[in-house]
């Protein structure tokens, strides 16, 4: 979603897991897109992509935070590396944090049928 290619549930490819997740349903998707739009607006002010802004924000949180971006091609890798050049002011960090804290995520992360598999006990070694 931060990459800008996904703006509605119709943008998911056939068989994409997200098309089954309640968080990405036609009802919940627009509500969850509000945070993406806020991040995008801040990124435009910084002349960077929303993905770069998010990575820069994570890297600014301290040495104990290590972002692991999903990188599917060379263009995304180069974009992610560009995040290292972005410096955020304390005010910008706070603006991003506030946007995240104020966001009301709608819909469960996984379909209800998957819930039992998500919270299973690990077998003893």
At which residue positions do the language-model features occur?
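Helix N-cap / loop-to-helix initiation motif
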Residues: 48-49, 73, 89-90
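Short, flexible micro-motifs
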Residues: 7, 73, 110
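Terminal-tail/helix-coil boundary detector
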Residues: 14-45, 60, 64, 78-125
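Hydrophobic faces of well-ordered beta-strands that scaffold small-molecule active sites
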Residues: 67-70
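Phosphate- and divalent-cation-binding pockets in alpha/beta enzyme and binding domains
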Residues: 1, 76-79
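Glycine/threonine-rich phosphate-binding loop and adjacent beta-strand/alpha-helix elements that clamp
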Residues: 53
């Amino acid at each position: 979603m931060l990459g800008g290619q996904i703006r509605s549930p119709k943008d998911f490819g056939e068989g994409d897991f997200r098309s089954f997740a309640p968080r990405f349903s036609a009802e919940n998707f627009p509500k969850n897109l509000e945070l993406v739009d806020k991040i995008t607006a801040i990124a435009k002010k910084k002349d960077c992509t929303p993905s770069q802004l998010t990575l820069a924000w994570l890297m600014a949180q301290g040495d104990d935070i290590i972002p692991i971006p999903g990188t599917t091609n060379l263009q995304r890798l180069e974009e992610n590396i560009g995040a290292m050049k972005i410096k955020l002011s304390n005010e910008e960090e706070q603006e991003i944090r506030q946007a995240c804290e104020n966001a009301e995520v709608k819909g469960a992360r996984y379909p209800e049928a998957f819930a039992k598999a998500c919270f299973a006990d690990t077998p003893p070694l």
